[in-house]
Amino acid sequence: MDYDSSDTMNGGSSNPLITKMNTMKLLYQHYLDKVTPHAKERWAVLGGLLCLFMVRITMAEGWYVICYGLGLFLLNQFLAFLTPKFDMSLQQDEENNELEAGEKSEEFRPFIRRLPEFKFWYNSIRATVISLLLSLFSIFDIPVFWPILLMYFILLFFLTMRRQIQHMIKYRYIPLDIGKKKYSHSSN
Protein backbone atom coordinates (compact mmCIF):
# COMPACT_ATOMS: atom_id res chain seq x y z
CA MET A 1 0.00 0.00 0.00
CA ASP A 2 1.76 3.00 -1.30
CA TYR A 3 -0.21 6.16 -0.71
CA ASP A 4 0.47 9.55 0.73
CA SER A 5 -0.85 9.53 4.29
CA SER A 6 -0.82 13.33 4.55
CA ASP A 7 -3.50 13.59 1.84
CA THR A 8 -5.81 11.13 3.52
CA MET A 9 -5.23 12.65 6.95
CA ASN A 10 -6.25 16.11 5.73
CA GLY A 11 -9.33 14.79 3.98
CA GLY A 12 -7.80 15.45 0.58
CA SER A 13 -7.14 13.05 -2.23
CA SER A 14 -4.49 12.64 -4.85
CA ASN A 15 -7.22 12.22 -7.45
CA PRO A 16 -7.81 15.62 -9.10
CA LEU A 17 -11.45 14.81 -9.85
CA ILE A 18 -12.24 14.14 -6.19
CA THR A 19 -10.32 17.27 -5.19
CA LYS A 20 -12.35 19.34 -7.66
CA MET A 21 -15.62 17.80 -6.41
CA ASN A 22 -14.70 18.61 -2.79
CA THR A 23 -13.86 22.18 -3.80
CA MET A 24 -17.22 22.50 -5.59
CA LYS A 25 -19.06 21.13 -2.53
CA LEU A 26 -17.33 23.65 -0.28
CA LEU A 27 -18.15 26.50 -2.66
CA TYR A 28 -21.79 25.36 -2.86
CA GLN A 29 -22.02 25.20 0.94
CA HIS A 30 -20.38 28.63 1.19
CA TYR A 31 -23.06 30.19 -1.01
CA LEU A 32 -25.83 28.39 0.89
CA ASP A 33 -24.44 29.80 4.13
CA LYS A 34 -24.33 33.31 2.66
CA VAL A 35 -27.96 33.07 1.48
CA THR A 36 -29.37 31.68 4.75
CA PRO A 37 -30.04 34.98 6.60
CA HIS A 38 -31.79 36.59 3.60
CA ALA A 39 -35.21 34.95 3.91
CA LYS A 40 -37.24 37.46 1.88
CA GLU A 41 -34.82 37.35 -1.02
CA ARG A 42 -34.71 33.54 -0.96
CA TRP A 43 -38.49 33.29 -1.12
CA ALA A 44 -38.60 35.92 -3.87
CA VAL A 45 -36.22 33.78 -5.94
CA LEU A 46 -38.44 30.74 -5.35
CA GLY A 47 -41.49 32.77 -6.41
CA GLY A 48 -39.68 33.86 -9.56
CA LEU A 49 -38.70 30.28 -10.38
CA LEU A 50 -42.28 29.10 -9.84
CA CYS A 51 -43.57 31.88 -12.11
CA LEU A 52 -41.01 30.91 -14.74
CA PHE A 53 -42.10 27.28 -14.45
CA MET A 54 -45.78 28.20 -14.76
CA VAL A 55 -45.07 30.36 -17.82
CA ARG A 56 -43.12 27.45 -19.30
CA ILE A 57 -45.99 25.03 -18.70
CA THR A 58 -48.62 27.47 -19.99
CA MET A 59 -46.73 28.47 -23.12
CA ALA A 60 -45.66 24.93 -24.02
CA GLU A 61 -49.09 23.48 -23.16
CA GLY A 62 -47.57 20.31 -21.81
CA TRP A 63 -45.77 18.66 -18.92
CA TYR A 64 -48.89 18.77 -16.78
CA VAL A 65 -47.89 15.63 -14.88
CA ILE A 66 -44.59 17.30 -13.92
CA CYS A 67 -46.55 20.36 -12.76
CA TYR A 68 -48.94 18.17 -10.78
CA GLY A 69 -46.05 16.30 -9.17
CA LEU A 70 -44.36 19.58 -8.22
CA GLY A 71 -47.63 20.85 -6.75
CA LEU A 72 -48.06 17.72 -4.63
CA PHE A 73 -44.45 17.91 -3.45
CA LEU A 74 -44.80 21.58 -2.49
CA LEU A 75 -48.08 20.84 -0.69
CA ASN A 76 -46.41 18.02 1.24
CA GLN A 77 -43.50 20.31 2.17
CA PHE A 78 -45.90 23.06 3.26
CA LEU A 79 -47.84 20.67 5.48
CA ALA A 80 -44.59 19.46 7.07
CA PHE A 81 -43.67 23.12 7.62
CA LEU A 82 -46.99 23.77 9.41
CA THR A 83 -46.94 20.59 11.47
CA PRO A 84 -45.31 20.50 14.91
CA LYS A 85 -42.35 18.18 15.32
CA PHE A 86 -43.93 16.49 18.30
CA ASP A 87 -47.53 15.45 17.70
CA MET A 88 -49.65 16.67 20.58
CA SER A 89 -52.28 13.99 20.10
CA LEU A 90 -49.64 11.29 20.70
CA GLN A 91 -48.34 13.13 23.77
CA GLN A 92 -51.88 13.35 25.08
CA ASP A 93 -52.32 9.58 24.75
CA GLU A 94 -49.02 8.98 26.53
CA GLU A 95 -50.02 11.21 29.45
CA ASN A 96 -53.22 9.19 29.97
CA ASN A 97 -55.35 12.08 28.84
CA GLU A 98 -54.14 14.37 31.64
CA LEU A 99 -54.45 17.36 29.35
CA GLU A 100 -57.69 17.24 27.43
CA ALA A 101 -57.91 18.96 24.07
CA GLY A 102 -59.08 22.49 24.56
CA GLU A 103 -58.19 22.56 28.26
CA LYS A 104 -56.14 25.58 29.21
CA SER A 105 -52.64 24.81 30.31
CA GLU A 106 -50.18 27.27 31.76
CA GLU A 107 -47.28 25.13 30.60
CA PHE A 108 -45.16 26.81 27.93
CA ARG A 109 -44.84 24.65 24.86
CA PRO A 110 -42.65 26.14 22.14
CA PHE A 111 -43.63 25.43 18.56
CA ILE A 112 -40.93 23.41 16.85
CA ARG A 113 -41.57 22.69 13.21
CA ARG A 114 -41.29 19.27 11.67
CA LEU A 115 -39.63 20.92 8.65
CA PRO A 116 -37.59 24.09 9.33
CA GLU A 117 -38.06 27.12 7.08
CA PHE A 118 -34.67 26.86 5.39
CA LYS A 119 -35.11 23.18 4.54
CA PHE A 120 -38.61 23.95 3.22
CA TRP A 121 -37.16 26.63 0.95
CA TYR A 122 -34.18 24.51 -0.09
CA ASN A 123 -36.30 21.46 -0.96
CA SER A 124 -38.75 23.69 -2.86
CA ILE A 125 -35.96 25.33 -4.88
CA ARG A 126 -34.46 21.96 -5.76
CA ALA A 127 -37.82 20.53 -6.79
CA THR A 128 -38.65 23.57 -8.92
CA VAL A 129 -35.28 23.52 -10.69
CA ILE A 130 -35.62 19.77 -11.32
CA SER A 131 -39.14 20.33 -12.69
CA LEU A 132 -37.86 23.08 -14.97
CA LEU A 133 -35.14 20.76 -16.25
CA LEU A 134 -37.60 17.91 -16.77
CA SER A 135 -39.84 20.21 -18.79
CA LEU A 136 -37.03 20.61 -21.33
CA PHE A 137 -37.30 16.99 -22.47
CA SER A 138 -40.27 15.78 -24.49
CA ILE A 139 -40.02 12.27 -23.03
CA PHE A 140 -41.53 13.64 -19.79
CA ASP A 141 -44.47 15.27 -21.60
CA ILE A 142 -47.03 12.60 -20.82
CA PRO A 143 -50.40 13.30 -22.48
CA VAL A 144 -53.06 13.79 -19.83
CA PHE A 145 -56.33 15.68 -19.50
CA TRP A 146 -55.11 18.49 -17.26
CA PRO A 147 -58.48 19.70 -15.81
CA ILE A 148 -58.81 16.39 -13.97
CA LEU A 149 -55.36 16.86 -12.41
CA LEU A 150 -56.21 20.43 -11.47
CA MET A 151 -59.52 19.49 -9.83
CA TYR A 152 -57.92 16.60 -7.98
CA PHE A 153 -55.13 18.88 -6.71
CA ILE A 154 -57.62 21.52 -5.54
CA LEU A 155 -59.68 18.86 -3.74
CA LEU A 156 -56.57 17.40 -2.12
CA PHE A 157 -55.37 20.87 -1.09
CA PHE A 158 -58.66 21.81 0.61
CA LEU A 159 -59.05 18.47 2.38
CA THR A 160 -55.52 18.44 3.78
CA MET A 161 -55.59 22.11 4.76
CA ARG A 162 -58.94 21.67 6.51
CA ARG A 163 -57.53 18.77 8.50
CA GLN A 164 -54.41 20.79 9.36
CA ILE A 165 -56.44 23.82 10.47
CA GLN A 166 -58.68 21.61 12.62
CA HIS A 167 -55.56 20.15 14.26
CA MET A 168 -54.22 23.68 14.86
CA ILE A 169 -57.51 24.76 16.47
CA LYS A 170 -57.81 21.62 18.58
CA TYR A 171 -54.31 21.89 20.05
CA ARG A 172 -54.14 25.69 20.02
CA TYR A 173 -50.98 26.45 18.13
CA ILE A 174 -50.14 28.95 15.44
CA PRO A 175 -47.25 27.87 13.23
CA LEU A 176 -46.78 31.30 11.65
CA ASP A 177 -45.46 34.49 13.21
CA ILE A 178 -48.53 36.47 12.16
CA GLY A 179 -50.34 37.97 15.14
CA LYS A 180 -47.79 36.86 17.73
CA LYS A 181 -46.35 39.25 20.28
CA LYS A 182 -43.00 40.73 19.34
CA TYR A 183 -40.74 41.76 22.16
CA SER A 184 -38.18 44.45 21.53
CA HIS A 185 -35.04 45.18 23.46
CA SER A 186 -35.60 48.21 25.68
CA SER A 187 -32.54 50.42 26.08
CA ASN A 188 -32.93 51.72 29.63
UniProtKB/Swiss-Prot annotation:
Q: How does it sit in the membrane?
A: Multi-pass membrane protein
Which Pfam family is one of those matched by this entry?
Answer: Rer1
Keyword terms, alphabetized: Golgi apparatus, Membrane, Transmembrane, Transmembrane helix
Q: Transmembrane ranges?
A: 62-82, 139-161
Q: Which residues lie on this side of the membrane: Cytoplasmic?
A: 1-61, 162-188
Q: Which GO terms describe its cellular component?
A: COPI-coated vesicle; COPII-coated ER to Golgi transport vesicle; endoplasmic reticulum; fungal-type vacuole; Golgi membrane
Which family does the similarity line name? Belongs to the RER1 family.
Q: What does this protein do?
A: Involved in the retrieval of endoplasmic reticulum membrane proteins from the early Golgi compartment. Required for correct localization of SEC12, SEC71 and SEC63 in the endoplasmic reticulum.
Q: Additional comments on file?
A: Present with 2840 molecules/cell in log phase SD medium.
What is the protein's given name? Protein RER1
Organism source for this protein? Answer: Saccharomyces cerevisiae (strain ATCC 204508 / S288c) (Baker's yeast)
Q: What is the lineage of its organism?
A: Eukaryota, Fungi, Dikarya, Ascomycota, Saccharomycotina
